[in-house]
Every structure is written in C-alpha cells, then in structure tokens.
C-alpha cells in the first residue's frame, strides 16, 4: 500500500471511523483515522485558504485553514517524517464525494521545500506556484476525475457542465517532480504548502473533503476510496 501523510479538510463526519461529529481538519499518518483533529466551520460557497508547515527541528506538522472573515481552525501534531515517509516523495491534493457531494475546487497552490545538509552547507530547495491552472497543465499528474482549465481552476472531483457537483467521485493532482523530503545528513528539512479552495454544495451535508498529501512517488488512487476515504486510503483501518 502507499505511504501517505495528509492534512484533511473533512466536511462530513464519519463517526464510525473515528471522525468527530462535526466538520474538522485533521492530520493523517498512514491512516484515514486522524491522529489529531480540530473543529472547522466550513463555509459553503466561500473561498478559504489552507496553510501547512513542517520543520524537522521541531518535528511538528501544523495546518491553519482560514476564511477572509477571520474564521480559522488550527491543528498540529508532533511527528518525525523521516520515520514515516521515503526519502523521495510526491506532493498532491486529493478530494472525494460520496452519497453526499460538493465541489472541490482549487484556485491556487504553492509549495516550498528546503533541505539543509551538514556536509556541504548547501540548501536543496523545490518551489512551485500555481496561481491558475491551464487546460493542458503539463507539470501536474492528474488522477481519477481531476481536471484543469475550467475558469483557470483545478476541479478535483466531477462537476457537471452546469457546475453541479457529482456524487461518488474521486480525483487527485500531484506535482510532476519528486521532492527530496529528507536525508540522513540533513540538518534541517522543512516545507510549507498553501492552497486556496472553494467547497460548494447544494446538499445540507457537503461531503467529503479535500486533503493535501505527501506520498511515495508512484502513488495512485486506491480502488474504492471515494467518500470518506478521500482518495487516499484503501480502507478505514
């Protein structure tokens, strides 16, 4: 199975798999059962921003999800990613719908990683920014139902021609270049990611959510991972 570390923006509480009974953000380490969650007031139809940071000195993964009106949620979890992830990874965004549905629209996405090594005092860095997404976005690997180019956005899950979200959909977008996320001689490994998103649903219960994830470089969508599994995990263990 793939090795996945993710920050989930979970719009639908699946209490049967350990979700709290409200929309939340969470940190997932190799399982959809979050290690840590925080309550999140998801604003239907409003553009939000997610900011994720990690630093190997503090060994802490943190995320803040906010809206322009100042409403925000914060979650952090202490983890040494050297012990969890392979040295080379890919970073991506994933989303799913199930019985209930929502649009999982990404308007922008940026990422920076730095690796400072002892031996050479050099810093290896990878940086990318998407302020919009074109129809033929060559530097993204699109999986499942993900598409780019509609209004310059990335749609992670299926949307009909009139803009209505579709159920039982899953899609992911990964940056094409592998990221050197850690190495044994590194003094500091750090990264930060930011994306802006729009979740819109005609349902009283939007579902299921968006995640920023880091995975082994050959990761693909597990079969049956629509709905509560967010396109990331093969099961709810």
Swiss-Prot record:
Concanavalin A-like lectins of the Diocleinae subtribe undergo proteolytic processing referred to as circular permutation. The propeptide is split into an N-terminal and a C-terminal part, the gamma and beta chain, respectively. These are then religated in beta-gamma order to form the mature alpha chain. The beta and gamma chains can often be detected in cell extracts. Residues 1-118 of the mature chain, as displayed here, probably constitute the beta chain in the propeptide, residues 119-237 the gamma chain. Mn(2+) binds at residues 8, 10, 19, 24. InterPro entries: ConA-like_dom_sf (IPR013320), Lectin_LegA_CS (IPR000985), Lectin_legB_Mn/Ca_BS (IPR019825), Legume_lectin_dom (IPR001220), Leguminous_Lectin (IPR050258). PROSITE patterns: LECTIN_LEGUME_ALPHA, LECTIN_LEGUME_BETA. One of its GO terms (molecular function) is manganese ion binding. One of its GO terms (biological process) is vasodilation. Keywords: Calcium, Hemagglutinin, Lectin, Manganese, Mannose-binding, Metal-binding, Vasoactive, Vasodilator. Hemagglutinating activity stable up to incubation at 80 degrees Celsius for 1 hour but diminishes with higher temperatures and is absent at 100 degrees Celsius. Binds one manganese (or another transition metal) ion and one calcium ion. The metal ions are essential for the saccharide-binding and cell-agglutinating activities. D-mannose/D-glucose-binding lectin which binds alpha-methyl-D-mannoside, D-mannose and D-glucose in that order. Also binds to serum fetuin and ovalbumin. Has hemagglutinating activity towards rabbit erythrocytes. Is not toxic towards larvae of the brine shrimp Artemia. Induces relaxation in rat endothelized aorta. Shows a transient edematogenic effect in rat. This is Concanavalin V. The lineage of its organism: Eukaryota, Viridiplantae, Streptophyta, Embryophyta, Tracheophyta.
């Amino acid at each position: 199975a793939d090795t996945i570390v993710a920050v989930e923006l979970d719009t639908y509480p699946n209490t049967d798999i350990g979700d709290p009974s409200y929309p939340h953000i969470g940190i997932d380490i190799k399982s959809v059962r979050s290690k840590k969650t925080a309550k999140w007031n998801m604003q239907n139809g409003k553009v939000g921003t997610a900011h994720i940071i990690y630093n190997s000195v503090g060994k802490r993964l943190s995320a803040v999800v906010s809206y322009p009106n100042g409403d925000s949620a914060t979650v952090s979890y202490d983890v040494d990613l050297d012990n969890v992830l392979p040295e080379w990874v890919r970073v991506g965004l994933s989303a799913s719908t199930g019985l209930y549905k929502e649009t999982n629209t990404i308007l922008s996405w940026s990422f920076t990683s730095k690796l400072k090594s002892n031996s050479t005092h050099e810093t290896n860095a990878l940086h990318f920014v998407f302020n919009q997404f074109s129809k033929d976005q060559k530097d993204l690997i699109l999986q499942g139902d993900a598409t780019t180019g509609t209004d310059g956005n990335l749609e992670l899950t299926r949307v009909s021609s009139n803009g209505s979200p579709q159920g039982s959909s899953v899609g992911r977008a990964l940056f094409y270049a592998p990221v050197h996320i850690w190495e044994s001689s590194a003094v500091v490994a750090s990264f930060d990611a930011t994306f802006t998103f729009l979740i819109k649903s005609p349902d009283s219960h939007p579902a299921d959510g968006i995640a920023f994830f880091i995975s082994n470089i050959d990761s693909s969508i597990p079969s049956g991972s629509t709905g509560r599994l967010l396109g990331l995990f093969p099961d709810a263990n």
